[in-house]
């Protein structure tokens, strides 16, 4: 079945319930409630253009120009519109005065370009009306002199003076648009004035009959003058009634009508027959028969000249048999083209009903339209502009309707079908969306198809819809059965009759076809007109934008729902029960001294503390730093937060909770031993400590490059911004803060809350070593010139340095700890290397268990990364010297291990094996330490 139209007709026989929009699930992650979103404002430019588009007279033009300029320009105080009166005088009627053409005004008129100034000079001011525009004006005000040009004569046809404020770029653009539309409105008013004859004085014909006879007026002339005096309506139907009644009386015809010719000369239409206004306009094609030749030849014809098809069409329209007919072309003086056919039917008198129309009747009709034709064509032109105005307003309303249904594609498509059918007066409308190489329709006039088995799918290169989708061009088919692409099998099976089709493409902002709309059977015409094509083209733009944005909105929503669902699942498994935090706080917060007497010394190893005691140790450190009291943090909330953070860590060999605890403890050591409060604000130190706790949340044991190479979900979310894992860690921290009962910053002011989150983001992102290497030169410069507490950049750099030193703090402990940490790190690295090999990629040497030589890798890491960091710390804080010395000591240990295994060789092919053998390496104090990765850590 290769035709879109047929399928859509077939599916209209079933009614389908509308699809219900999916209900959002999950919890939204947010920072703090913002100000309410701004309400949409009215489109003042569109309103201004619509008002200009409706102008039909001078008074309306002046008012529309004033309203339009007031709508788009700032602080408009005065608008004067001067129109050409005679050959050179430019006159304003409100108040009445003539435009002085001197000074700035003369300059603008001669240059024929808009001019702005800070007021008019004395030479410009000839009277009181312009006195308020005298220079100098206020600094924020100006006078605009806007000449409107008549392109035919090349002269200025009107001038507008505006007293307003200074313009922005957007207001300048709006003014240019208004100028163009004002000129179009002026031309339209001038054209209407030229075509409309002066009103005939309402005097008695009988009273002036003798005078007109003396002037040589005939009886026809007097009747025509009387008729013209009655043609004051702006409605073309009323004008036709008066003219046709006159023609019926003068030609003795039983019926008279006007067959109006469409702009494309493809059809005739009739709304009035004699004294009767038809309920619906009757239209029929002009491509066949003698009536079409009349439009081309401009010659009168009678009944005997018509074809049988012509006669049948006219008899169907009149509802009676034709005995006689006279058809006279009505020619426009402006275009010299036939605009209508005046027809008289069945002449009374004489041998009625066989009487024929005479040359005198032909003269009567021609004489009538010689005087009334311009009135009729002007009124028809006015009605057309009114129709265009209504269509523009309808399109604007359609756009509003479409853009309020972006949340559901099916509802949007249903709205598109309804609006398209109403705009074009079509019997049926179908919309197909392009899905790869198929056109898919699941929304029809009858409703929405929920079951995929009922949706229509056709190849994108078959049938009428396929042709439009392939070419991207609109297709108007007057006779469906005569078109080679139409498949009439569906019509034969359903009994439906497809007469004509208008099929148009729907494109996105990149001019790519994303769908096709198909209108079937014009209701009030023989086929779809050129006007319908233009309307469909304009309508398709709104359709394309709304569909593209709706599909994008759907994808974003689906991604958000998945994210919310994943977040809900994670939070469910991380949920802290009331018993857990109650048990943690049962005996109050333990003093730091009770944990270990050396807890606040750099020599203390936090990994020696049992993991079950680490949550209390976090609370103890926060209390010792006085953050709980200073920021009035609720203890149950803090306990829940700490337990949630602990549960937020996975269990890879190294990047687990014990690593986060060690990093947090080192931050505490820096605070206690280096007196950080003399360098940083309290909120910065607090943010540093919380960031240490959260800096590796939900770490998967793989680095950023692996996330990008494996095209993981995290990479899709964050790769464009860089620091994939670090951004994920921060997002997880925000998710925990947004969990009920875990927001430890809940009592912060909005300003402090935002600053705390900004600090956490920057500090956590600083754990990416790539970031550290980018700012290393800035850190060196800061150390050279000395730290300046009043320099905000120094604050940011110091926080980044402190975070990195905390993250690598295991290197500042004893050799046993350093050796154990190396084992954990390389187990994690080798696991990633194995995954990369399984993906078909070649891992880095440090992650390849078959190639990595750990001692050399550790020496390189300590020389190029760790030691420079702690050297900078020593330069800024002399008390941190012991940290640098201990890192240097551990580097010497690795040098000796490397030398030993260079001589003796590795114990086996596995690079981790040497850490599991009982080799001894002389410690720096002369004792011998077993090189055993499983030995207990010093406490």
Curated annotation (Swiss-Prot):
Residues 16-38, 197-217 are annotated as: Disordered. Its EC number is 3.1.4.17. The 3',5'-cyclic-AMP phosphodiesterase activity is stimulated by 3',5'-cyclic GMP. Specifically inhibited by Bay 60-7550. The keyword Hydrolase applies. A lipid is attached at residues 5, 11 (S-palmitoyl cysteine). Keywords: cAMP, Cell membrane, cGMP, cGMP-binding, Cytoplasm, Hydrolase, Lipoprotein, Magnesium, Membrane, Metal-binding, Mitochondrion, Mitochondrion inner membrane, Mitochondrion outer membrane, Myristate, Nucleotide-binding, Palmitate, Phosphoprotein, Repeat, Zinc. Residues 236-373, 408-547 form the GAF domain. GO terms for cellular component: axon; cytoplasm; cytosol; dendrite; endoplasmic reticulum; Golgi apparatus; mitochondrial inner membrane; mitochondrial matrix. Residues 577-901 form the PDEase domain. 3',5'-cyclic GMP binds at residues 430, 445, 464, 487, 498. cGMP-activated cyclic nucleotide phosphodiesterase with a dual-specificity for the second messengers cAMP and cGMP, which are key regulators of many important physiological processes. Has a higher efficiency with cGMP compared to cAMP. Plays a role in cell growth and migration. Belongs to the cyclic nucleotide phosphodiesterase family. PDE2 subfamily. This is cGMP-dependent 3',5'-cyclic phosphodiesterase. The lineage of its organism: Eukaryota, Metazoa, Chordata, Craniata, Vertebrata.
């Amino acid at each position: 079945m290769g035709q879109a139209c047929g399928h859509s007709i077939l599916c209209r026989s079933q009614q389908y319930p509308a699809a219900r929009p999916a209900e959002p699930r999950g919890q939204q992650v947010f920072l703090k409630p913002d100000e309410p979103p701004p309400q949409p404002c009215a489109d003042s430019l569109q309103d201004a253009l619509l008002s200009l588009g409706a102008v039909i007279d001078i008074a309306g033009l002046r008012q529309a120009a004033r309203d339009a300029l007031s709508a788009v320009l700032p602080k408009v105080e005065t608008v004067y519109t001067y129109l050409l009166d005679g050959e050179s005088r430019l006159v304003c009627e409100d108040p009445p005065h003539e435009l002085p053409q001197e000074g700035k005004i003369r300059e603008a008129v001669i240059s024929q370009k808009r001019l702005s100034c800070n007021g008019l000079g004395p030479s410009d001011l000839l009277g009181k009306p312009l006195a308020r525009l005298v220079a100098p004006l206020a600094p924020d005000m100006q006078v605009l002199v806007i000449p409107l040009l008549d392109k035919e004569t090349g002269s200025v046809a009107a001038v507008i003076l505006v007293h307003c404020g200074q313009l922005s770029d957007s207001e300048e653009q709006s003014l240019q648009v208004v100028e163009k539309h004002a000129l179009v409105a002026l031309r339209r008013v001038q054209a209407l004035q030229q075509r409309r004859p002066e009103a005939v004085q309402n005097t008695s014909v009988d009273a002036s009959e003798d005078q007109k006879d003396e002037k040589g007026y005939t009886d026809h002339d007097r009747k025509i003058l009387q008729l013209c005096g009655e043609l004051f309506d702006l409605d073309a139907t009323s004008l036709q009634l008066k003219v046709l009644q006159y023609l019926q009386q003068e030609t003795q015809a039983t019926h008279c009508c006007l067959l109006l010719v469409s702009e494309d000369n493809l059809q005739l239409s009739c709304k009035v027959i004699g004294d009767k206004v038809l309920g619906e306009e009757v239209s029929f094609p002009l491509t066949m028969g003698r009536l079409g030749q009349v439009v081309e030849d401009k010659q009168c014809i009678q009944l005997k000249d018509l074809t049988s098809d012509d006669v049948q069409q006219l008899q169907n329209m009149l509802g009676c048999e034709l005995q006689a007919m006279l058809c006279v072309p009505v020619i426009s003086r402006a275009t010299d083209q036939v605009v209508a056919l005046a027809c008289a039917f069945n002449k009374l008198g004489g041998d009625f009903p066989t009487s024929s129309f005479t040359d005198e009747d032909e003269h009567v009709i021609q004489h009538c339209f010689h005087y009334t034709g311009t009135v009729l064509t002007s009124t028809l032109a006015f009605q057309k502009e009114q129709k265009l105005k209504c269509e523009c307003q309808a399109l604007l309303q359609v756009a509003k309707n479409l853009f309020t249904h972006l949340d559901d594609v099916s509802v949007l498509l249903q709205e598109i079908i309804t609006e398209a059918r109403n705009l074009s007066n079509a019997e049926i409308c179908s919309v197909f969306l392009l899905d790869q190489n198929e056109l898919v329709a699941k929304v029809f006039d009858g409703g929405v198809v929920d079951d995929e088995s009922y949706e229509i799918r056709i190849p994108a290169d078959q049938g009428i819809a396929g042709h439009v989708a392939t070419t991207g061009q609109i297709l108007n088919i007057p006779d469906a059965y005569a078109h080679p692409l139409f498949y009439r099998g569906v019509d034969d099976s359903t009994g439906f009759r497809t007469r004509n089709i208008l099929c148009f493409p729907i494109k996105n902002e990149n001019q790519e076809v994303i769908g096709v709309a198909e209108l079937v059977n014009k209701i009030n015409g023989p086929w779809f007109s050129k006007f319908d094509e233009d309307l469909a083209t304009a309508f398709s733009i709104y359709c394309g934008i709304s569909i593209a944005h709706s599909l994008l909105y759907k994808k974003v929503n689906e991604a958000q729902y998945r994210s919310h669902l994943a977040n809900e699942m994670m939070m469910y498994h991380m949920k802290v029960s009331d018993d857990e935090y109650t048990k943690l706080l049962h005996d109050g917060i333990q003093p730091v001294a009770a944990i270990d007497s050396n807890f606040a010394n750099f020599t203390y190893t936090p990994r020696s503390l049992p993991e079950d005691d680490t949550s209390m140790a976090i609370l103890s450190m926060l209390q010792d730093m006085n953050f709980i009291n200073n920021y009035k943090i609720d203890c149950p909330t803090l306990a829940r937060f700490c337990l949630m953070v602990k549960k937020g860590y996975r269990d890879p060999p190294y990047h687990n909770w014990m690593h986060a605890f060690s990093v947090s403890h080192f931050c505490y050591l820096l605070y206690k031993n280096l007196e950080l409060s003399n360098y940083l604000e309290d909120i910065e130190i607090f943010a540093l400590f919380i960031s240490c706790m959260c800096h590796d949340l939900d770490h998967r044991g793989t680095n950023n490059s692996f996330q990008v190479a494996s095209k993981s979900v995290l990479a899709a979310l964050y790769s464009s911004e860089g620091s994939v894992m670090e951004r994920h860690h921060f997002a997880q921290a925000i998710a925990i803060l947004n969990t009920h009962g875990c927001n430890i910053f809940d009592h912060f002011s909005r300003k402090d809350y935002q600053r705390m989150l900004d600090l956490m983001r920057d500090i956590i992102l600083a754990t990416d070593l790539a970031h550290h290497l980018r700012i290393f030169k800035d850190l060196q410069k800061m150390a050279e010139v000395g730290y300046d507490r009043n320099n905000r950049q120094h604050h940011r750099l110091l926080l980044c340095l402190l975070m990195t030193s905390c993250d690598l703090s295991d290197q500042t402990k004893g050799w046993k700890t350093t050796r154990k940490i190396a084992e954990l790190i390389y187990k994690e690295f080798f696991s990633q290397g194995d995954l990369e090999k399984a993906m078909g990629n070649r891992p880095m040497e440090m992650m390849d268990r078959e190639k990595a030589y750990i001692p050399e890798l550790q020496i390189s890491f300590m020389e190029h990364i760790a030691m420079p960091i702690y050297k900078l710390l020593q330069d800024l804080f002399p008390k941190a010297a012991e940290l640098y010395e201990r890192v240097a000591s551990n580097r010497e240990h690795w040098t000796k291990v490397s030398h030993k295994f260079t001589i003796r060789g590795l114990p086996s092919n596995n690079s981790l094996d040497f850490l599991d053998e009982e080799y001894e390496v002389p410690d720096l104090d002369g004792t011998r330490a077993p090189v055993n990765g499983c030995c207990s850590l010093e406490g």
